[in-house]
């Protein structure tokens, strides 16, 4: 369920702070969100794939921790990211 290099580059160019940014919180959350969406689609078709379901839960937890960090340190960046990713509807 890994992201292709082209998809990663597209996400990082949109959400990164600069062209080669991979470590900013926004970039990490955007990449995790795309992986979560892909895994969710996979699990809709393969309902009994419990190994991937555990991986999904770990990714969701990691994204939750990063969002909590961002909300605590910079609320404006947090709200902007949530709106751009379409989370918290």
From Swiss-Prot:
Report if keyword S-adenosyl-L-methionine is assigned. no
Q: What are the GO MF terms of this UniProt record?
A: rRNA binding; structural constituent of ribosome
Q: Which Pfam families match?
A: Ribosomal_S15
Keywords on record: Ribonucleoprotein, Ribosomal protein, RNA-binding, rRNA-binding
Q: Does the keyword Iron-sulfur apply?
A: no
What's any GO biological process attached to this entry?
translation
**Cellular component GO terms held in the UniProt record:** cytosolic small ribosomal subunit
What the protein does comes down to:
One of the primary rRNA binding proteins, it binds directly to 16S rRNA where it helps nucleate assembly of the platform of the 30S subunit by binding and bridging several RNA helices of the 16S rRNA.
Report the sequence similarity comment from the record.
Answer: Belongs to the universal ribosomal protein uS15 family.
> What is annotated about its quaternary structure and interactions?
Part of the 30S ribosomal subunit. Forms a bridge to the 50S subunit in the 70S ribosome, contacting the 23S rRNA.
NCBIfam families (alphabetical) = S15_bact
Protein name listed in UniProt: Small ribosomal subunit protein uS15
